[in-house]
Amino acid sequence: MVWPYLVSSVIFGSLFGLMAIGLTLTYITTKVPNFAYGSFVTIGLYTSYSMNRFADFTPYISAPIAFGIGGLSSVAMYLGILRLLARRGSSLVSLMIATLAIDIAFIGIFGIYADYLRYGRNLTDSLSFYSFLDDFSMFGAQGLTYVAPISLALITLGLFMLLTRTKFGVAMRASVENPTLARVLGIDVEKVYVFAWFLAGGFAAMSGSFYTLYSGGGVATGSGLIVEIFAASILGGLSSIYGAAIGGIIIGAGENLLTGGGIVLLGSWVLDYQKGIPLLIMIVTLLVLPRGLASLLK
């Protein structure tokens, strides 16, 4: 009875860790809460869905393609909208509202694409589809139970090596901590920001691609996960990549385990309050650690 909840908690926590890292990358570069971030998760969902239906690819094969599409979409959003608004003097509140508008536009685009697949390509489940069943299994657990945490660990390690062992990583850190001084030193801050936004969109889309093996999806799936993603990033300190990874694990696993335990002990009505669990975890943690988990990592 406990095993399925443990497995799903590992998957859920690892995927939210990936998503939270990406959201943190967008925040530390522009200081704007990106409420459109969940839509990049949906891009990964529909990339895997399309490639599965048309080419019979598993999400493991389509994940790198989803990474590229999500990364390019994220860069387009930054260069085509947010940077232009910022250069015209828009406030942080205006930029935040712009991300909300972009998210609504994305949902509309996904709806148009889903309708095309439904009526033009006869894919009747395009608006809302079940999880894919073509995952491999190992030691009695589905493959994503191993792939998701390994991917999170490798990406976190890769970012650590990039930021601490390479010249470009040092330039990234300088651009984030003091962009004005970085420009004086000759660092191309905009190039750094574009790279960070590419990674952020890529991580979101890749996690969305993996998500199709865990749960079903639809046009607003990514947007519906934004509460958990923000909770994980804030729990991690909002400006710490490593804190975001840990925060994602805590939020994802905590939501799964507490929801599952609540259903067993109290009944199915607990599901109605599932979205409140990540916020509760975040609030309790911040009462103890006001600066989030990042304060423990310094």
Whereabouts are the PLM-identified features?
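Short loop segments and helix-boundary regions at transmembrane helix junctions
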Residues: 29-33, 72-120, 162-165, 223-224, ...
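Transmembrane helix-bundle core of multi-pass membrane transporters
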Residues: 84, 93-165, 192, 264-275, ...
